[in-house]
Regions:
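Short, well-ordered coil/turn segments that N-cap beta-strands
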Residues: 4-6, 40-42, 70-76, 94-95, ...
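Conserved N-terminal beta1-alpha1 strand-loop-helix module at the mouth
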Residues: 2-49, 57-63, 67-73
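Conserved, mostly hydrophobic/aromatic
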Residues: 16, 36, 89, 97, ...
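Alpha-helix-loop-beta-strand connector modules within alpha/beta enzyme cores
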Residues: 54-78, 117-139, 160-164
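Glycine-rich, proline-tolerant flexible connector loops at the mouths of alpha/beta enzymes
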Residues: 42-67, 100-114, 143-150
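N-terminal small/glycine-rich loop or linker at the start of catalytic domains
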Residues: 1-21, 98-111, 132-149
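Active-site mouth loops of central-metabolism enzymes
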Residues: 11-28, 74-83, 110-116, 143-156
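Catalytic cores of alpha/beta
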Residues: 82-93
Length: 173
């Protein structure tokens, strides 16, 4: 794989909002994201289309996308854990879907209660939904530089996951 360009994604909205003990008002989230867009961020992970029961702080993902002042210079992305989330993301007119797994089996199991293979299998359905709706998919790999449970992750494992992403037609890793 020849890397031609590295793009940095601002994940503060999604990662930060989900970490708050209290649920922030949707209009406050929209305001923060609008300021990030205005500041020139080109790729922003605005939320996640996860079950509202799992992470109530992100239950308003679709409403955020309805109200953000979109800018052609900013790609609005969100984490999508499953096909149901992918369908919600399509309905919300998300610019880009992000899927993720952990390179280490133990971390992936603790994080999403799936093996790496099970996660990859689920991503195929998400990729199909995204493809039918012309939405690009980005594949993220957690614990790529080390796992708190297993230590170093072999480079071969990262290459295998990256190759699976490529075979599914993902736009990047």
């Amino acid at each position: 794989m020849n890397v031609k360009q590295v793009k940095v994604t601002e994940v503060g909205p999604r990662d930060g909002f989900q970490s708050e003990k209290t649920v922030l008002k949707t209009e406050d989230k929209v305001d923060i994201i609008n300021h990030l867009i205005k500041a020139g961020f080109q790729r922003i992970e605005v939320s996640s289309f996860v079950s509202p029961k799992a992470i109530p702080q992100l239950a308003d993902a679709a409403t955020i996308l309805e109200n953000v002042k979109r800018n052609s210079n900013a790609t609005l992305a969100a984490l999508v854990p499953n096909a149901k989330g992918a369908l919600r993301a399509v309905d919300a007119k998300l610019d880009e879907i992000v899927v993720f797994l952990s390179a280490s089996e133990s971390h992936n199991k603790k994080n999403v209660n799936r093996s790496v293979k099970e996660s990859l299998t689920g991503f195929k359905e998400i990729a199909d939904i995204a493809g039918k709706n012309n939405i690009p998919v980005q594949g993220d790999i957690a614990t790529a530089f080390g796992c708190p449970f297993e230590g170093n992750v072999p480079a071969k494992k990262l290459a295998e996951i990256s190759n699976e992403y490529k075979l599914m037609g993902f736009k990047g890793v």
